[in-house]
Amino acid sequence: MSRFFHAKEDSDSDTSSSEDEVEDQKVNKSAKFRDDLDFMAGPEEDEKRVVRAQKDKKFDELKGIIKQNRDAKSNKDLNRLLTGFDSLAKAYDKSKTVFQRQNVANPRFYIRSLVEIEDYVNKLWDDKDAKSALSKNNAKALPPLRQKLKKYIKDQQLQDLVTDYRVNPDEDGYETPEDEDDDDFGEVSESKAEKSPGKPSEKAAVSDSDSDSDDDDSSNWSSEPESNSSDDEDSVTKMEQLRRYFLKKEFRVESKDDKKEKKKRVIRVKEAVEEDDDADWTPVNREKSVVHFDPKEEVTHDVMIKKLNEVMSARGKRTTDRNQHVANLRKLLEVSEEKELGLGINVKISFCIISALFELNAKISDHMEYETFMTTLQTVNSLLDLLIGTDRVKLSVTYAEEDENLKDDTQEYRIQGSILIAVQRLDGELAKILQNADCHSNDYIEKLKAEKDMCSLIEKAEKYVELRNDSGIFDKHEVCKVYMMRIEHAYYKYQDQNEEDAGKLMDYLCNKIYTLDDEKRLRQRAMLCHVYYLAVHDKWHRARDLLLMSHMQAIVDHSDVDTQILYNRTICQLGLCAFRHGFIREAHQGLSEIQNTQRAKELLAQAVGTRQHEKTAEQEKIDRSRQVPYHMHINVELMECVYLICSMLLEIPHMASCEFEMRRRMLSRSFHYQLKQSEKASLTGPPENTREHVVAASKAMLNGDWKKCQDYIVNDKMNQKVWNLFHNAETVKGMVVRRIQEESLRTYLLTYSTVYATVSLKKLADLFELSKKDVHSIISKMIIQEELSATLDEPTDCLIMHRVEPSRLQMLALNLSDKLQTLAENNEQILEPRTGRGGYQGPGSWFPGRNERQGDKQKGSGGYQGERRGGQGQDGKRGNWGSQGGQQRRHPQKPRAF
């Protein structure tokens, strides 16, 4: 075939292929148009369409942000929560106009969201552990979130709405009207979703028919016009659907019955889901191990002992329920009493119950619950009554388990154990309970009432010891512990009534320990408690002599910590006793040991030390366990005030007598520190606390104004804080006023001795409201002790001053001369190293190697050798300060005046 025919065939094929491409494009365009209209076609043409209001759209926007905020809270993502809160606030501000236009109040779900965020932030802010566990970004976002939330609620004036919501919060599962609308919309969408599965089949059918028609069109050229007409009809149909889709419909109005029916349907669905969930779970009840005896078997001693051993074998295991263990033992005791198995088994089971009650706490360092404590106390009390009522039962730690006799009633029952140790353990648990209670609450008072029952129990234990002491079932240490417990519950209490009987009882108990105790610790503690008791009851001389004879000052440093704490408490109480008796110097010496350390509360075991970084957690726990219960505390403020008053009465006359001495000895550094601090103040107001009252009184006494000093020490405020705390307040106040008068007189005479030539005793007596005899006695004592250079003239009743001491002007002149002399000596010391043998010899004198022979340098000759201030010279010896072989005259330096 020629090329011409080939070219024609090629052209025909090209034209046919191009025509096919055009047809395909037409078909694809029509199919694409149909697909674009399919998404707008509803599942059913007759179904009504709902048009949502703008209010509902705003509700949806707010609820979406609230849901995101809840997710952020659940994930503890505070950065995301902060961003979500800002978005929520902005969205709410935009929605305000819509709500106002449609007369819609603030949505309750929005207020609920603000309350939830506020509660979450406040809870996280108060929980220190949770705050410390936050990441760096979350910890940084927490303060601004809290601040923004408070400011937003305040600026938007939402406080009332938030308060109303907190008063009447929504219950779990409660839905607000806005939530109900949202649920209705959700149900409609769900119904559409349920009907939509039929749509793909229709589309599939349409697509199948389209594919068939396309195949027919491609195969039959004659049917092309028909296919085009069908495409036009489809397009018209789709346009009609589009017009109907965008046609606005009226709102669908639902009646109340419809809403109720929807609610019921939702509830039924929820119940069905819950039932399905519950069907997957099987409830498992914890079976309690109950003690059962075989009903066919007689409960004898052997059966009961076997069952008791079986129950006690579970003691201490991890899987053992401790409360159930106690219940099992009580059940055994009931059966034993019912079957009348004898006192031996009853006492054994009772003692096992007491041990089990003590073991209810997993850690021995934790305190026992108060209810458990009272239960244990009643159990121990009933067991003690049983032991006191019969002498056929012996309970002792000296018996072994093999030596026990629980069933043979012809002999004495022997049981291993010690009721005295149980009483001692119970006393320790009471101390722990009081240590861990809030001392400023009524709960502490309620728990403190148990001390009365505890004291009765200890007295009963003492009675039991005295009844059975001859049987040899007790150890000496146990007996001493019982007496010591009774002493420790009585030594700090002031007995206003029956003081003689209480004193005799204390002497009896302490003498028992002095006699029985072979160890030193209990004897030392009994001695200190005895001294404390005597000091509280104002028996100063007996308490002082007893403490000095015990030599506790020398051995207390080698004692245990609890004994050292008791020693500190005793010394403080002894100092207060000396103050009440008017022994100011002794009181000052006793209290200074504690007050000068600036750690009075820590030394008295009334607070934990502030330097906790130096201690481990275990040491801190031990220190807290040593704390004294609050009702046994010594008033530290009272003790400090007494110490400052004693310092004032001793230090102010001493300061007046040593006014012009450069290096006077201070009796109390803390008192001087308080005076200096008050002098540094630019503006001094009226005193407020006890310390400021004493400082103001000291300044008045230094000027000789005893009345002003008295007004600062004795007034209504000081009465409430200090003087009313003494049981003999009026006597103590009278003693303090008398000492203020006497020390003010001494200070006045020492301060103004250079001013007076003679002073009338009568005038001094009238000035300080003292008797002439007292004034004469005070002045005579001052003259004898060489504190005052004067003579008493009896015919004229005058005090004649001796001009031995320089006047104030002379003293100032002497001080000035001393300072000038010191200044001159300092200048001489600075200039002396620069002078040579013949005066100033020029700059060459500083370099002896230039003007002298090498041999002279080796011999050490020359005016200056080595360093200027007498350091090592070139020959290894000290350098000369003057000419060769000469000795410089040095004057001793006098003490400086400043």
Curated annotation (Swiss-Prot):
Coiled coil: none annotated. One of its GO terms (biological process) is formation of cytoplasmic translation initiation complex. Residues 1-38, 162-238, 829-898 are annotated as: Disordered. One of its GO terms (cellular component) is eukaryotic 48S preinitiation complex. Pfam families: eIF-3c_N, PCI. Transmembrane segments: none annotated. The keyword Protease does not apply. Its main location: cytoplasm. It is found in: Cytoplasm. GO terms for molecular function: RNA binding; translation initiation factor activity; translation initiation factor binding. Component of the eukaryotic translation initiation factor 3 (eIF-3) complex. PANTHER family: EUKARYOTIC TRANSLATION INITATION FACTOR 3, SUBUNIT 8 EIF3S8 -RELATED, EUKARYOTIC TRANSLATION INITIATION FACTOR 3 SUBUNIT C-RELATED. This is Eukaryotic translation initiation factor 3 subunit C. It comes from Caenorhabditis elegans.
